[in-house]
Amino acid sequence: MSLNRREFIKTNAVAAAAATAGMSLPAAALAQAGSPPLQVRWDKAPCRFCGTGCSVLVGVQNDRVVATQGDPEAPVNRGLNCIKGYFLSKIMYGADRLTRPMLRKKNGAYDKNGEFTPISWDEAFDIMAQKWKQALAAGGPDAIAMFGSGQWTIWEGYAASKLYKAGFRSNNLDPNARHCMASAVVGFMRTFGIDEPMGCYDDIEHADAFVLWGSNMAEMHPILWSRITDRRLTHAGSEVHVLSTFEHRSFELADNGMIFVPQTDLAILNYLCNYLIQNGRVNREFVEQHVNFKVGATDIGYGLRPNDPREQSATSNGYPGADGKPKGDPGAATPATFEEFAAFVSTYTLDYTARLSGVPAEKLQRMAELYADPDKKIVSFWTMGFNQHARGTWVNNMIYNVHLLTGKISQPGCGPFSLTGQPSACGTAREVGTFAHRLPADMVVGNPAHRKIAEELWQLPEGTIPAKVGLHAVAQSRALKDGKLKCYWTSTTNNMQAGPNINDEIYPGWRNPEAFVVVSDPYPTVSALSADLILPTAMWVEKEGAYGNAERRTQFWRQQVRAPGESRSDLWQYLEFAKRFKIEEVWPAELLDKKPEYRGKTLYDVLYANGVVNRYPLADVGVVNKHAIDGYMNDESQHFGFYVQKGLFEEYAQFGRGHAHDLADFDLYHRARGLRWPVVDGKETLWRFREGYDPYVKQGEGVRFYGNKDGKANIFALPYQPPAEVPDQDYDLWLCTGRVLEHWHTGSMTRRVPELHRAVPEAVLFMHPDDAKERGLQRGMQCKIASRRGEVFASLETRGRNKPPRGLVYMPFFDEGRLVNKLTLDATCPLSKETDFKKCAVKVQKA
């Protein structure tokens, strides 16, 4: 690459700016400031990291990503990136990138305790098929399972769901989004009868105030935080309220920062409702027209194993009782009146709530006045503080209570907004339905009508999809440990580091001699190194993909470069693996008798070469994408001989079109910077459920929550309850886990970026200085953190970005050398089955 004098000066200016910021940029990225580098091709793609859905421009030179930059045409991020986004060009080029399948072998044959040995894809699929067939023959569909991801592309998740739920006839498929978004899903479904936020990011520029509940947006959603910051600093009267169990960077902008005792957010939400009612600030007209009241089941347990005393004493956890029958239903609810709801929340007075939560009364009252003010437009944001909660579904329902009582919902600048942590937790896990109980477009396996729709669209005989809900994430780990699962395939996730209670419930199952565990991953993660077979996987722009972000925006990208060595995409893996099974090997004879024409065919033939998925010819790949890359082709389509991604997407889209989950035509997404569904007549929807914005709300209806048959939303009466585990004299501190700005989740990508690793090389334990002093600890000292389940060692930090109150410590989970999830409890919300990573009891002492 040659530069003229002017370009050389620009390059040096950019390099100097980067050095000042502590960044090093690829040479090609420094070629010019304000214009693309020479000989570099640029194309759009959504960011690989969080659920915000920023768009970036990807610079490619000689089949290598050499630079990325914020996409100035992107409505989400408007040309900005966070620190992780600036280094996207480096995530695929770690020195230890896997390029060949690796099987544990001893003396030339598979051995559970053998050493990882490179093998061919044929050998990998041969042993996988052998193990899966043995498991299916001996234990049926219940003996196999898959753990997927909110980082799957839309068509990867859809193909995996077809393979398991239709092909293997097993609903034992669950995503790692179970650990982060399941409570939001169940909360939406219980209140509105339909999933995902009713608003969009445009709410930020319309709102007067923002309330953060268990969300450190400054670090976890920094681009959205920049938009909130701009609104706060430029809009007169704008306010930011932040609630958390510890102080973090979002508090720097807060007008009203509140630190509460873990789990008492339940009481605070009820106090807000009580305040609205007692002070006559309920929007009675809205409530009477659009709301029903219900009382939820309460003694629901904590999602622990059935033999745990906390579950044995619970009366409505759904577990088998002494008579073998389920003990109630944790999701049950009975109708109530407004007056009954008012009486229920009346005990949550200001004084009681302040004492219980530890939040000063004047701070609670200020927030209550904000919600009560009819002239204030408010957006409530939350993430894992709400969702990773033993009552996660409840707190989601309860924030909706507040917005429904005030009518501050489904209009510009007003609404409850659940943020996502993964790039396609919405688009893949939720919309495609890769949860153990779901099908696409909010359909569920337990509903016969929904199964019928899926079977017809997939051209399956009636009865193919089982009605039995499969194993959720935590249940999968327990089933592996108990020997009930024999074959397990995980992809695009790192549960051996990210899952709860690793020592007791995850590692023993993976190393169970009866289990065969496969991990698809680009890097040798903790999970990969604990498996029996590792499949090297293509990353991000090494394949054509699609993600769906937190505001219902579906975004596509084109393959930009080839994956290294023998790495293959997850999509390629699922379709190729399907070729190893004849229908007769996986379906019972009585089912096959209903479709005798399928005899002799493979699962690939029936699921993916079915005349629908394979109807778009290979030539379409170039035609659809000619506007961006002349002569474009992607590896999967080239291999299978048709436009695989388009065929899968268009079949999938049939589930939602006409059912308020409408997706646009495939080709349109490759031109757009994403579209927010429902997309009807080519027009996206910004605000749902309100006339004038939502095509599914008819003229004259005003507001209609059409997910429920009567068009009304539900307000739930739900109490404060303590968590499953609280500090005591032996384990005297609360532990909260989470992330940091510089790393994403378990760090399998970001820790391989030198600049990000140098910025935060290891996880530290954040502690209040007085708690440290009381224990004879000093900043920088190595300490031991122990719970009833395990122990880890980390350096102590008493300053910095996170400032816990006395009695609580905080530790991020990105560091594979300090596995904080050895400490956490595998308690879950009994409704959503999502893990509570935010509270357990630990003790800290000198190492």
Curated annotation (Swiss-Prot):
Residue ranges of the region described as Disordered: 303-332
Protein's recorded name: Periplasmic nitrate reductase
EC number: 1.9.6.1
Record carries keyword Cytoplasm: no
Example GO biological process: cellular respiration
Swiss-Prot/TrEMBL keywords: 4Fe-4S, Electron transport, Iron, Iron-sulfur, Metal-binding, Molybdenum, Nitrate assimilation, Oxidoreductase, Periplasm, Signal, Transport
Subunit structure: Component of the periplasmic nitrate reductase NapAB complex composed of NapA and NapB.
Species per Swiss-Prot/TrEMBL record: Bordetella petrii (strain ATCC BAA-461 / DSM 12804 / CCUG 43448)
Binding residues for Mo-bis(molybdopterin guanine dinucleotide): 84, 151, 176, 180, 213-220, 244-248, 263-265, 384, 388, 494, 520-521, 543, 570, 737-746, 821, 838
A Pfam family: Molybdop_Fe4S4
GO CC aspect terms: membrane; nitrate reductase complex; periplasmic space
